[in-house]
Amino acid sequence: MQYVRLYSDENGDSRFAEAALALDEIDYRPPAPAVFVSHAFKSDFLQFIRLPGGWTCEPINPPERQFLIFLDGHLEVTASDGEKRSLGPGDRVLMEDVHGKGHRSHVRGAHDCLAAIVPIA
């Protein structure tokens, strides 16, 4: 499964990278046919976040490593190295830039952006 990784490099700059998560075929719930499943991530909770249309924030760092799974709307994220990504429904991002210069975010257009946040250990 492909996802985007946002991390801090050794100089504290936030950077994007393409990443992949292996999915192994297992008999998850017999007698249903086998499915493809990733390894388990430890998480204490799941949150949903709605960012209003036009919402903008200056450089921030996430409070902890977390997956953002975009459900609706579009968020433009700018890493501190200047690279921009437009993220929308179905996109998955592992936010790991918890230290350093952080990243900027902006909801594109008037439509709200809805995402699920899953903090991971």
Model-inferred region functions:
Residues 92-98, 108-121:
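A short hydrophobic beta-strand segment most commonly corresponding to one strand
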Residues 60-61, 67-88:
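A short beta-strand-loop-beta hairpin characteristic of the jelly-roll/cupin
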Residues 10-59, 113-121:
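A short glycine-rich, His/Asp/Glu-containing loop-to-beta-strand
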Residues 1-8:
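Short acidic, Pro/Gly- and aromatic-enriched capping/linker segments at domain boundaries
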Residues 25-27, 101-107:
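Short, Lys/Arg- and Gly-enriched loop/turn segments at beta-strand edges
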Residues 55-57, 76, 92-93, 99-104:
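Histidine-centered metal-chelating micro-motifs
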Residues 59-61, 107-108:
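Exposed beta-sheet edge/beta-hairpin loop segments within beta-rich domains
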Residues 21, 80-97:
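Short acidic-glycine-tyrosine-enriched beta hairpin
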